[in-house]
């Protein structure tokens, strides 16, 4: 404002933001010099700039835009929000200073971790580098406010990011440099203009200081929670009374049309059997691994690998489903166990050596690869000698005679102490689709066959068409992400407002928060095999695990907070709504179960009418986990979060439509958007199919919401549990995981029963006090 900008307080904070920049640059330079010289750390400063900006039409715009984004967004997220929350929470419990101190430390750790993707050694160098600056910036914020930290951050980044612009001597370079300087001086220019307009420096009015704000008197709610039942219309009444019949029809349709069988056979061997088969395969190669080697195994699916999935989709569409099913297990990979052998101790160079063995359902070796350190000495074979070795490997590993095959490519890679070769052979005898070709790849490291595999060559025109389609659909996928982000933000805002206005069930919030947090931590621990497969042997194991653990805890806290807020708000809305105990001769819960069965059956029927764009693959939701049966239990308990989210959606839609009396189109739009987003999240490998299933689910769920659930949100857990159990049965049948399915289903139903009974109890104190107000 004009009064604020013309004050010495704002001018001083603006100048202070600029003056801190050289101090910060000096601190960074000193840190790099000291750690690189005396500690042997590696932190390349060139990664702080990007010379590629010079290839853009206006090179100055990129550093300006990125710096502004970082200054405003990061200072708000990493300084203003956590430090303010620390002060508020600390004051709430009588320890304001302690709350602020803890927030200062936490924001510094998170800020450093959020920037740890920069290259550097050791892996924790970047968080250590940013810890002290983050502390300093937090103290600046606490003393002077957000203005100097935003200016400091934005100008600091602009100085680094614009370095390439000032290293160029070309036509137009001075214009770009002038734009950068002008952008950096805009805050000072604003101060100067306001000072000139005011004619003199003016004291900052007390009304413009942060301390002048006072919370206003709490306004009464314009529309309290409904205490009388909604009038059931003719259409709703007919639908509700027809639900038992519709539910039976849904079950019949589900049995008749649901894809209980995948197009490829599921894995039936467990992790121990796969590791034993891989050990035997290495022993057959004459390899004896010492005690320093660690073994990890997880299920590998083609549908999880974009490159492999492109081969599978190409054969499915171009050669046909029958040909596809015949090729799965030969040229095309079936579901396999991938066993990894790696070392995390000893010499860092030698730790680059790894073995990976893919084991199929019959305990046969699908593929075996041996990654060698680049400097490992070996033979220098000629092309002919290496080719002879590769042809022999085709016979021994795949039982394929190499004589009829066509040599497509032969590449040589010269290593420091050996020569590596890679060969690709084409097999035109196997039909994989017009223009495609079945191929074999063999890698020779020195005189050792270090890898061999099979794949499908896909024509460039087909790949380009798929890429263009994916690019167009990427907008839809991003829209799905935006929907989830908006939903999470809505949960946070509505939950906080509900807390402030006493429109939240604190008991439900606490229970769901605790359960979800513990569940998330246990799920991360149970997912250890998958995490271990991604660990790098060239980085310290302790630092990697520390980052994984801290990231898991942070994610668990955020997820638990959102789930708890959804539960508190959703349970409040449900428990302050009139109860619908019976529909005709049936209990209302039975009608909710029938509605869920009807939805699943209708989805299965309509989905069966569409031509599949890709093969159906069995999932591996439990088998890859460390303890599959424990994973089934955790999956069932996780239903509490889904039920809370759906209760929250019903509550929010009810508020936006004034108790489902106005703007019903908005209710349909919200449900459609959420169903589309959920389908895209679950079906990333088949976006068109996900859009179809999401549209069907959205339309049907909207109908059930308007015709049944709006009259009593307490029916949501039973309705949602039915859909989850029946949908999970399809995936479990495809994966031949009936025992985990049974455990998951039992726990899910138990959670749904508990949640329904919880919602039917007398409202909590918070809810009761609201109704009395």
What is the predicted function of each stretch?
Residues 1-17, 91, 198-238, 570-590, ...:
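Membrane-interfacial, low-structure loops and terminal tails that flank and connect transmembrane helices
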Residues 56-205, 622-763:
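Transmembrane helix-loop-helix hairpins at the membrane interface
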């Amino acid at each position: 404002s004009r009064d604020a900008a013309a004050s010495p307080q704002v001018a001083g904070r603006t100048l202070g933001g600029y003056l801190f920049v050289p101090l910060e640059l000096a601190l960074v330079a000193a840190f790099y010099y000291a750690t690189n010289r005396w500690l042997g750390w590696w932190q390349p400063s060139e990664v702080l700039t990007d010379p590629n900006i010079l290839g853009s039409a206006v090179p100055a715009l990129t550093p300006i835009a990125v710096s502004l984004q970082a200054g405003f967004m990061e200072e708000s997220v990493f300084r203003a929000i956590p430090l303010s929350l620390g002060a508020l929470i600390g004051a709430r419990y009588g320890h304001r200073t302690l709350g602020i101190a803890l927030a200062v430390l936490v924001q510094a750790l998170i800020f450093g971790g959020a920037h740890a993707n920069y290259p550097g050694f050791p892996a924790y160098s970047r968080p250590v580098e940013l810890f002290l600056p983050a502390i300093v910036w937090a103290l600046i914020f606490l003393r002077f406010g957000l203005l100097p930290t935003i200016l400091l951050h934005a100008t600091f980044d602009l100085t680094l990011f614009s370095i390439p612009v000032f290293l160029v001597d070309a036509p137009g370079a001075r214009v770009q440099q002038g734009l950068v300087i002008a952008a950096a001086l805009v805050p000072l220019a604003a101060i100067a203009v306001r000072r000139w307009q005011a004619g003199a420096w003016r004291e900052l009015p007390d009304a413009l200081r942060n301390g002048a704000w006072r919370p206003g008197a709490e306004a009464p709610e314009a529309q309290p929670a409904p205490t009388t039942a909604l009038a059931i219309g003719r259409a709703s009444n007919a639908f509700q009374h027809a639900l038992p019949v519709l539910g039976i029809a849904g079950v019949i349709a589900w049995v008749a049309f649901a894809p209980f069988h995948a197009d490829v056979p599921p894995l039936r061997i467990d992790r121990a059997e796969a590791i034993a088969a891989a050990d035997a395969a290495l022993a057959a190669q004459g390899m004896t691994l010492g005690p320093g080697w660690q073994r990890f195994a997880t299920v590998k699916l083609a549908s999880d690998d974009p490159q492999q999935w492109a081969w599978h989709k190409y054969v499915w569409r171009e050669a046909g489903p029958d040909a596809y099913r015949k090729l799965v297990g030969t040229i095309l990979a079936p579901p396999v166990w991938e066993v990894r052998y790696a070392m995390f101790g000893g010499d860092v160079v030698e730790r680059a050596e790894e073995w990976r063995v893919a084991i199929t359902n019959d305990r046969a070796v699908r593929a075996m690869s041996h990654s060698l350190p680049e400097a490992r000495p070996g033979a220098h074979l000629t092309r002919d000698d290496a080719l002879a070795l590769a042809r022999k490997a085709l016979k021994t590993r795949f039982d394929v005679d190499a004589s009829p095959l066509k040599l497509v490519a032969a590449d040589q890679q010269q290593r420091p102490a050996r020569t590596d070769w890679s060969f690709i052979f084409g097999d035109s005898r196997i039909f994989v689709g017009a223009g495609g070709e079945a191929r074999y790849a063999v890698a020779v490291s020195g005189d050792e066959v270090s890898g061999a595999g099979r794949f499908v060559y896909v024509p460039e025109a087909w790949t380009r068409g798929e890429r263009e389609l994916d690019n167009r659909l990427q907008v839809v996928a991003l829209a799905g992400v935006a929907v989830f982000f908006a939903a999470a933000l809505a949960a946070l805002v509505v939950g906080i407002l509900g807390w402030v206005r006493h429109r939240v069930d604190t008991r439900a919030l606490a229970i769901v928060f605790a359960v979800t947090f513990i569940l998330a931590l246990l799920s991360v621990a149970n997912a250890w095999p998958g995490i271990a497969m991604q660990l790098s042997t060239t980085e310290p194991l302790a630092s990697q695990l520390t980052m994984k653990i801290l990231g898991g805890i942070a994610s668990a806290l955020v997820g638990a907070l959102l789930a708890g807020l959804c539960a508190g708000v959703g349970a409040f809305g449900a428990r302050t709504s009139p109860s619908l105990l019976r529909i005709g001769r049936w209990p209302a819960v039975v009608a909710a179960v029938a509605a869920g069965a009807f939805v699943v059956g209708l989805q299965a029927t309509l989905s069966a009418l569409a031509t599949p764009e890709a093969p159906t693959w069995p999932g591996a939701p439990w088998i890859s986990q460390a303890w599959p049966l424990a994973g089934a239990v955790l999956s069932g308990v996780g239903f509490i979060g889904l039920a809370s989210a759906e209760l929250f959606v019903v509550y929010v839609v009810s508020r936006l439509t004034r108790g489902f009396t106005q703007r019903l189109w908005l209710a349909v739009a919200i449900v459609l958007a959420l169903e589309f987003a959920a389908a895209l999240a679950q079906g990333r490998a088949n976006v068109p199919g996900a859009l179809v299933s999401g549209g069907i689910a959205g339309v049907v769920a909207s109908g059930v919401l308007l015709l049944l659930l709006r009259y009593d949100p307490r029916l949501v857990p039973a309705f949602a549990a039915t859909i989850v159990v029946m949908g999970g049965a399809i995936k479990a049948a495809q994966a031949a995981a009936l025992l985990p399915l049974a455990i998951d289903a039992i726990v899910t139903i138990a959670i749904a029963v508990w949640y329904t009974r919880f919602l039917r109890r007398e409202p909590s104190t918070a809810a009761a006090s609201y109704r009395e107000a």
